[in-house]
Swiss-Prot record:
NCBIfam families: pth (TIGR00447). The keyword Hydrolase applies. Monomer. It catalyses: an N-acyl-L-alpha-aminoacyl-tRNA + H2O = an N-acyl-L-amino acid + a tRNA + H(+). GO terms for biological process: protein quality control for misfolded or incompletely synthesized proteins; rescue of stalled ribosome. TRNA binds at residues 14, 64, 66, 112. This is Peptidyl-tRNA hydrolase. Gene3D superfamilies: Peptidyl-tRNA hydrolase (3.40.50.1470). PANTHER family: PEPTIDYL-TRNA HYDROLASE. Keywords: Cytoplasm, Hydrolase, RNA-binding, tRNA-binding. The active site is at 19 (proton acceptor). The record marks 9 as: Discriminates between blocked and unblocked aminoacyl-tRNA. One of its GO terms (molecular function) is tRNA binding.
Length: 183
């Protein structure tokens, strides 16, 4: 089984913020591949379904960003999911808006959600970085917890990530990035 984790914060207040783009992607995947309704497990919302030939668990941790690793560890321990079968979708302020990068392993880049997951399961999992840019005159925390200016454009990119996800799961990361960013 593969585990796809979207990072974000629970609650309507954060629903369309930059920091919640991981949740947005997981929701788009669930809709696009007709996953069953999410249920509460592992201090997260989870749903299990199929993407092509892959059995997949979708996860949205509910412990807030800086404790996401607790949910991921609980799930991976129970279901015996190896780190290389985990893909985490998250915002990245170091990438320009509309930019997507895929990487196996690496550091947290100052992202508290990744830092939490790194300390819980190590660093050998896949990351899909979703560029949200950085506001020069704004506190970083305030910036990532603020709503996107153009949610329609973000929604198009999020839907493109979901629509092309099977390519990534089949091992074609370069093709996935190329297809998603051509939107």
């Amino acid at each position: 089984m593969l585990l796809l984790v979207g990072l974000g914060n629970p609650g309507k207040r954060y629903a369309e913020t930059r920091h919640n783009v991981g949740f947005m992607i997981i929701d788009a995947v669930a809709r696009g591949f007709f996953f069953p309704e999410f249920c509460s497990k592992h201090d997260a919302l989870v749903s299990i379904g199929n993407i092509g030939t892959h059995r997949v668990m979708l996860m949205k941790p509910l412990l807030y960003m800086n404790r996401s690793g607790t949910s991921v560890l609980s799930c991976t321990s129970m279901h015996k999911i190896a780190p290389e079968h985990i893909t985490v979708f998250h915002d990245d302020v170091e990438l320009q808006p509309g930019t997507i990068r895929v990487k196996l392993g690496g550091g947290s880049g100052g992202h508290n959600g990744l830092r939490s997951i790194d300390s819980a399961i190590g660093k050998a999992y896949w990351r899909v970085r979703f560029g949200v840019g950085r506001a020069e005159l704004c506190n970083l925390s305030d910036y990532v917890l603020s709503d996107f200016e153009n949610i329609a454009q973000v929604t198009d990119l999020v839907n493109s990530v979901a629509a092309n996800l099977q390519m990534l799961l089949d091992g074609n990361a370069a093709g996935f990035v190329s297809k998603v960013t051509s939107v």
